[in-house]
A protein has these predicted regions:
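Mature-region segments of soluble proteins
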Residues: 2-4, 53-54, 67-76, 90-204
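N-terminal secretory signal peptides and thylakoid transit peptides that target proteins
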Residues: 3-22
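Structured mid-domain segments that build the active-site/substrate or prosthetic-cofactor binding neighborhood
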Residues: 25
Length: 204
């Protein structure tokens, strides 16, 4: 098997593992469940496509610094390999679109999670914020938040937030043409406005 084929399989397996973990923990908070359900609905209906690909795009809900943080977090979740990662497929735009359609209290919970990420970075690493932390420190924090059985009550908000953004990142990635065609092997039939679902494991 060629190296690129190994890479494709490994990437799909990694994203499946991320998805299964997100689904398993999605009931950790009601706002997480609400937001991830909305994200799946948006991804499967492709309602966000036109807004995401617009050349003059700007965030409708997130501030510019919040959007920058979402870009960084999602790229750490699905990084670029031989195919573009979350940043290259505009997952941040998908997330902003979903947040715009979400209930105000759900949006507020997500934004509170972003604020918590920056505050926790300052507390743990003496960094200005998450983006000011080193790559190693950033990965350390996200690893802590994704660890099963993490008993740290101070990180409960962060764990709920990370499960939400992880699930939304996966759905947003598969909303993109690259995610569908390169990762799922779509021949062009799935990337349609009427796409209603997906039979891959990560969307079960």
């Amino acid at each position: 098997m060629a190296t690129s084929e190994h890479s494709d399989i490994g990437r799909r397996q990694a994203i499946r593992a991320l998805a299964s973990g997100a689904v398993a923990a999605v009931a950790s908070a009601s706002w997480v469940e609400s937001l991830t359900a909305l994200a799946r609905q948006q991804a499967h209906a492709h309602a966000a496509t036109a807004a995401i690909v617009a050349q003059n795009w700007s965030p409708s809900t997130l501030t510019a610094p919040q959007n920058d943080l979402v870009v960084a977090l999602t790229e750490l979740i699905i990084p670029e390999t031989d195919t573009p990662g979350a940043k290259g497929t505009n997952v941040n735009r998908f997330i902003d679109h979903v947040l715009t359609d979400a209930q105000p209290e759900v949006r507020a919970s997500f934004v509170r999670g972003l604020t918590w990420i920056d505050a926790r970075s300052r507390a743990l690493f003496k960094a200005r914020d998450f983006l000011g932390a080193s790559a190693e420190q950033q990965k350390t924090l996200l690893t802590r938040l994704s660890a099963e059985g993490n008993p740290d009550k101070e990180e409960a908000i962060g764990r709920d937030f990370f499960e939400a953004i992880k699930s939304m990142t996966i759905d947003g990635y598969y909303t993109s043409e690259i995610g569908l065609r390169k990762e799922l092997g779509d021949n062009g039939q799935l990337f349609l406005p009427q796409f209603q679902g997906c039979d891959h494991h990560e969307h079960q």
